[in-house]
């Protein structure tokens, strides 16, 4: 569950109908509130401030992190919650699939920006 899921949830509560808007990234969490499971989906994260970590995708137990330097790391969060063992070479198909999903998301969602915060604030 992410904060962007609240609006579709509140709309579903208010209207008693599933709120459908393709421009929203969130999904109603009504199934969870009714004690059911939500369908699995990718969760995306983006950092625009000065850090090497740039973006990440979580799918089920799996997390792929992309760095500004071009490096990637793949973790199984169920088995390695501390993210100590990079598994991209152990699970190359999963790595490539998640990398492709992250690239598609970046293309469609992430705005162009200046990633050096010193330039953004005229430092």
PLM features: residue spans?
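Intrinsically disordered, low-complexity polar regions and short flexible loop motifs
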Residues: 80
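A general alpha-helix detector
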Residues: 9, 83-86
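Charge-dense polyanion-binding interfaces
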Residues: 97-115
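Active-site-proximal N-terminal segment of extracellular/periplasmic enzymes that hydrolyze or transfer
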Residues: 85-93
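Hydrophobic packing residues in well-ordered alpha-helices of helical domains and bundles
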Residues: 57, 95-98
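Residues within well-ordered alpha-helical secondary structure of globular protein domains
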Residues: 12, 35, 90, 100-104
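C-terminal cap/loop subdomain of S1 sulfatases and analogous C-terminal strand-loop tails that border
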Residues: 2-77, 108-112, 118, 123
């Amino acid at each position: 569950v992410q904060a962007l899921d609240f609006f579709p949830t509140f709309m579903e509560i208010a209207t008693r109908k599933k709120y459908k808007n393709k421009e929203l990234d969130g999904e109603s969490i009504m199934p969870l509130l009714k004690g059911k499971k939500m369908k699995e989906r990718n969760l995306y994260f983006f950092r625009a401030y000065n850090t090497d970590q740039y973006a990440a995708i979580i799918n089920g137990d799996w997390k792929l992190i992309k760095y500004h330097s071009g490096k990637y790391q793949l973790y199984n969060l169920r088995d390695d919650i501390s993210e100590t063992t990079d598994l991209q070479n152990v699970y190359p198909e999963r790595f490539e699939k998640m990398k492709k999903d992250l690239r598609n998301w970046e293309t469609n969602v992430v705005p162009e920006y200046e990633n050096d915060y010193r330039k953004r604030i005229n430092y």
